[in-house]
C-alpha cells in the first residue's frame, strides 16, 4: 500500500508539473502569483510523498538530497520564467540596452513606491507585489543552497554567490529588455535570502539542512 501511494504521488507530481508548464508557457494564459504559490506548494508536497511516504528514516539519506535538488531545479525554472518570460509580470525579450532603465541609487525605487502609494497613485497590491515580491524572490535559496552545497553554509560565500547571481540577472534583464537593472532589487533580493539563511542558522532547522549533505565522517 505504501509503495502504491508513493507511485501514485509520483504520477500526480508529474501531471501537476506538466499542467504547470503548459499554463505558464501557453500563449494567452496569465498565471498570477497566488496560483504560482499553489503550484509550487502542490509540487513540493506531492514530491515529498512520492519520495518519503512509508520509507524508514534509515533509508531517507539520499532521498533528502534528491528532494532538495529537484526543488532547486523547479525553483530555478519558476524564477527564470518570472524574471524573463512571464506575461503576468510583463516580461518578454526586447533587446535594447536601455540604460534609462538602470537605477544605481540605493532605496530610490523603494522610496518612490511608498510615496506613490501615499498619494494614492498606485494600489497596495502593486506595492506588495514589487517590494515584498523582490524580498521573497530569492529567499528559498537561503535553504536550498546550504542544504545542497556545504561551502554555501558560510554566510560570506552565500552572500557573495547571491550578490554575483542577482547582479548578473539584473544586467541580463536590461540587455534583453525583460526588465530594469535596479540596485534596490539587489538589496531586497539579497536581504530576503539572508533573512532566511540567518533564521535557519540560529534555529534547529540548520541541523536538518546540514543533514541533507553531511560532511564526511573522519576516521
Identify the residue ranges that each predicted region occupies.
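Bulky hydrophobic segments
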Residues: 1-177, 197-219
Amino acid at each position: 500500500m505504501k509503495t502504491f501511494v508513493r507511485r501514485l504521488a509520483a504520477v500526480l507530481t508529474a501531471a501537476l508539473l506538466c499542467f504547470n508548464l503548459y499554463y505558464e508557457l501557453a500563449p494567452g494564459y496569465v498565471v498570477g502569483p497566488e496560483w504560482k504559490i499553489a503550484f509550487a506548494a502542490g509540487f513540493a508536497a506531492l514530491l515529498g510523498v512520492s519520495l518519503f511516504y512509508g520509507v524508514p528514516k534509515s533509508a531517507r539519506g539520499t532521498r533528502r538530497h534528491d528532494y532538495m535538488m529537484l526543488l532547486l531545479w523547479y525553483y530555478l525554472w519558476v524564477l527564470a520564467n518570472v524574471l524573463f518570460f512571464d506575461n503576468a509580470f510583463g516580461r518578454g525579450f526586447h533587446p535594447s540596452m536601455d540604460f534609462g532603465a538602470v537605477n544605481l541609487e540605493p532605496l530610490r525605487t523603494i522610496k518612490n513606491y511608498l510615496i506613490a502609494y501615499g498619494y494614492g497613485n498606485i494600489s497596495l497590491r502593486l506595492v506588495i507585489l514589487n517590494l515584498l515580491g523582490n524580498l521573497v524572490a530569492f529567499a528559498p535559496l537561503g535553504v536550498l543552497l546550504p542544504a545542497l552545497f556545504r561551502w554555501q553554509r558560510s554566510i560570506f560565500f552565500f552572500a557573495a554567490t547571491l550578490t554575483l547571481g542577482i547582479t548578473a540577472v539584473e544586467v541580463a534583464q536590461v540587455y534583453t529588455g525583460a526588465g530594469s537593472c535596479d540596485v534596490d532589487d539587489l538589496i531586497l533580493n539579497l536581504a530576503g535570502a539572508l533573512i532566511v539563511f540567518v533564521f535557519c542558522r540560529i534555529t534547529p532547522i540548520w541541523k536538518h539542512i546540514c543533514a541533507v549533505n553531511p560532511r564526511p565522517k573522519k576516521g
